[in-house]
Amino acid sequence: NNPAIAYLLEGNSMVDQKLVMAHVYAHVDFFKNNFCFQMTSQGRDARDASDVRKWIDAMANHGAIVRKWANRIGIEKVEQFIDACLSLENLIDPQKPFLPKDFSPKSSDDEQEEVETPEVPLLRVDREYMESFINPDEFVEAQKKKLADEAEQALRFPVAPERDVLGFLLENAPLQRWERECLAVVRAEAYYFLPQMQTKIMNEGWASYWHSRLMTENICDASEIVDYADRCASVLATTPGQLNPYKLGIELFRHIEDRWNKGQFGKEWDDCDDWELRRHWDRRTELGREKIFEVRSLYNDVTFIDEFLTEDFVLDQKLYSFGYNERNSRWEIESRQFNEV
């Protein structure tokens, strides 16, 4: 929503309220600035006509649509159809929000005429007795098969694979009006929440990074710091075999900030293989804060991890590969190798 709206639970303690506000403010900053959310922050819904800057209203409209058809068709029938749609809600195209909006696949109503297979183009022969040598049966059959495959490809629908399965169904499936409207609701919301899935680690890491700084440097007083530390520890706790996006995100942002503050980047750093020199490397460049704001804007989880998850970070954070030992009935470290992690 624009402006963003957040809610506080009335029964929370004051420490919890402060923590939630600090955390949510950082989330809002991420929503407003990360490229994955640019369609929502600019008011463009990638796949339908609603203005996503007013998603409080859009969600209310979606609810009104569903209730309208539930009253007319029956709540059980509508719920069953929506459940079926929700089972497909991840079958959308992550790239489509960044493409032009002129999404117009061929209509299934268009009659496709049967395509006749053209005659096989034979090589010219001046002498009839040379025909079997110049155009042998194997060659003719191969050419016939090639032409038949091309004719079949021309009849295929859609001609090219379509990643946005929900959009394809919306445009081409023989749906009743109420089914089409309900499917459009599910699809619009799937696209709206897509950036959340693409940036879960970064988003939670950014919010945790800033709530940690705000709470310890500006907001908490001495009487609240222990309670805050207890709440924060429970959020950042990790267990073997599980990935905590809050913990991984905050530590990776801190790692980036520390590296760029010390100048641990660039060709000279990459080419250095002296472990002792790397351990004490500090060029005092102080570019860490600038770098993490750049990362916040230009990366998603895949590129974030691919670019900044280094072997040094894995060793420092003990991000080992765990496996379950059935003999001991417990999780154990299987590998400490960076590539396997």
Please give the residue ranges for each predicted region.
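Active-site-adjacent bridging/hinge elements
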Residues: 1-3, 173-190, 225-226
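Short pre-active-site segment immediately N-terminal to the catalytic Zn-binding motif
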Residues: 3-20, 194-202
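Non-catalytic terminal regions of proteins
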Residues: 15, 227-341
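Active-site recognition of the HExxH zinc-binding catalytic motif
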Residues: 15-32, 204-212
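Post-HExxH zinc-binding segment in Zn-dependent metallohydrolases
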Residues: 31-108, 208-221, 234-245
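Long, low-complexity, polar/charged, intrinsically disordered or flexibly structured peripheral segments
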Residues: 109-172
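Active-site-adjacent structural elements in folded domains
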Residues: 152, 168-173, 191-197, 236-240
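Hydrophobic/aromatic-rich, well-ordered segments within soluble, folded domains that form packed cores
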Residues: 186, 194-217
